[in-house]
Amino acid sequence: MKEGIHPMYNEVTVKCACGNSFLTRSTRKEIFTEICSACHPFFTGKQKLVDTAGRVERFKKRYGQA
């Protein structure tokens, strides 16, 4: 690699709006995010399934998944 043309790749702290923070590496000095794995509904288990017109129940009934 050529000397002096690549950006500095440092260890930085990623800060989330929920207050969680973790370390990673980046060319930026600091990173702010609105949602992370600590507060995202998919990772916290608080994800809600939106059922439009009973399609999920119809699928479960049709294919025998209870």
Swiss-Prot record:
Pfam families listed in its UniProt record: Ribosomal_L31
Biological process annotations from GO: translation
Record GO terms (molecular function): metal ion binding; rRNA binding; structural constituent of ribosome
Entry GO terms, CC: ribonucleoprotein complex; ribosome
Source organism superkingdom: Bacteria
Keyword tags: Metal-binding, Ribonucleoprotein, Ribosomal protein, RNA-binding, rRNA-binding, Zinc
Cofactor(s) listed in the protein's UniProt record: Zn(2+)
Residues the record lists as binding Zn(2+): 16, 18, 36, 39
Cofactor note: Binds 1 zinc ion per subunit.
Record carries keyword RNA-binding: yes
Subunit structure: Part of the 50S ribosomal subunit.
Its job: Binds the 23S rRNA.
Family listed: Belongs to the bacterial ribosomal protein bL31 family. Type A subfamily.
PANTHER family recorded: 50S RIBOSOMAL PROTEIN L31, CHLOROPLASTIC, LARGE RIBOSOMAL SUBUNIT PROTEIN BL31A
Identification of the protein by name: Large ribosomal subunit protein bL31
Organism: Trichlorobacter lovleyi (strain ATCC BAA-1151 / DSM 17278 / SZ) (Geobacter lovleyi)
Gene, per the UniProt record: rpmE
